[in-house]
């Protein structure tokens, strides 16, 4: 699909959000004076994606406005107004083909790559939730993100309908050959939500998660197997939040190197985080 005005068939969830009263808001994009084309703004220091062959990264047009999915880096932030969507869309298909679960910790965003993992902070009360982008929207002005009902509940914005939030990119999920999210990357629940607020590790250097185990012996076995893998080494981190023993490869010289490795397919669903 060429980068021009293109109409992409979106889900009933996304299109339905056009008529949802809670989905009015500010986008991260500014329009050209004489064109209905929206490009990334400086809120996220993003750039147009080169992944044009990936269906969820193709430009698409809604109500005469063209949106270009973008590439962002771990640690980038943006502030804006969040809304939420729920009962009217529960059980319908999202833009990436999943079945929408209003109770899962997911979100709709106009241009972030599918399966981007975001930490969302309600600036009114400092409550936080971690969500995974699995849908497109909201497609009206003055909204930065549409949260699921479950995510909105976590940061206490159900009653208000909207709230000022800060979004931070904390990682990137991936899918296996069946286009299913690989649950070992983040602590996902049975219905695709991120369980236990998706606790991951943050810091300065980048590493790649290759497994997560309830049983410490499982983590130790994998860590020993890949103690030295190519130029990388393994390490285990145990979360005090969910009790999972996560196995990481370390030694990446840059975020780009870590992301290239995660995308190489060496480990199904490899997931980039900051050490």
Curated annotation (Swiss-Prot):
Name of the featured protein: Endolytic peptidoglycan transglycosylase RlpA
Organism whose genome encodes this protein: Campylobacter jejuni subsp. jejuni serotype O:2 (strain ATCC 700819 / NCTC 11168)
Principal place of residence: membrane
Membrane topology qualifier: Lipid-anchor
Keywords: Cell membrane, Cell wall biogenesis/degradation, Lipoprotein, Lyase, Membrane, Palmitate, Signal
EC code: 4.2.2.-
Chain ranges of the SPOR domain: 200-275
Gene3D superfamilies: RlpA-like domain, Sporulation related repeat
Domain of life the protein comes from: Bacteria
Signal peptide: 1-22
GO terms for MF: lytic endotransglycosylase activity; peptidoglycan binding
Covalent lipid sites (N-palmitoyl cysteine): 23
One Pfam family from the record: SPOR
